[in-house]
Curated annotation (Swiss-Prot):
Organism field: Campylobacter jejuni subsp. doylei (strain ATCC BAA-1458 / RM4099 / 269.97)
Gene3D superfamilies documented for this protein: NusB-like
Any single biological process term in GO: transcription antitermination
Short name of one Pfam family: NusB
NCBIfam families cross-referenced by the UniProt entry: nusB
Identification of the protein by name: Transcription antitermination protein NusB
Stated role: Involved in transcription antitermination. Required for transcription of ribosomal RNA (rRNA) genes. Binds specifically to the boxA antiterminator sequence of the ribosomal RNA (rrn) operons.
Domain of life: Bacteria
């Protein structure tokens, strides 16, 4: 059974693939099969993925307010996907903020450049503080 961390890795893969080819969602089942995401974890993955897409404009507007000199679209695909996932979980789910930030940092360490973990922490921490 896949862990929640592996589920989040899959969501990042789905968001990345969506950005590269938003006209076609055939990649969804392929990515989930490849990563062995099944049953309850598949439902969790798809809920996160579709929740992000359904709220993408709101998420991006919120994130843009915490990106000093950049827009979310100026970031790399992976960094953008990690921030969108983190923001979605903070804004629309009951996942504890400490877990969201830790997962974003771990995903950034695995998938992004060396400066990304600190950047993810700063942006998502600012979002948490503004939300209170």
């Amino acid at each position: 059974m896949a862990t929640r961390h592996q589920v989040r890795q899959s969501v990042i893969s789905l968001l990345y693939a969506f950005e590269l080819n938003s006209q076609n969602n055939v990649f969804v089942d392929e990515i989930l099969d490849e990563k062995k995401i099944r049953n309850e974890q598949k439902n969790f993955t798809l809920n996160l993925y579709h929740g992000i897409l359904d709220n993408l404009n709101n998420i991006d507007e919120t994130l843009n307010s915490f990106l000093n000199d950049n827009q979310i679209t100026a970031l790399g695909h992976v960094e953008r996907a990690i921030l969108r996932l983190g923001a979605y979980e903070l804004l629309f789910t009951n996942t504890p903020s400490a877990i969201v930030i830790n997962e974003a940092i771990e995903l950034a360490k695995e998938l992004a450049n060396d400066n990304s973990p600190k950047f993810m922490n700063g942006v998502l921490d600012a979002l948490i503080k503004a939300k209170k």
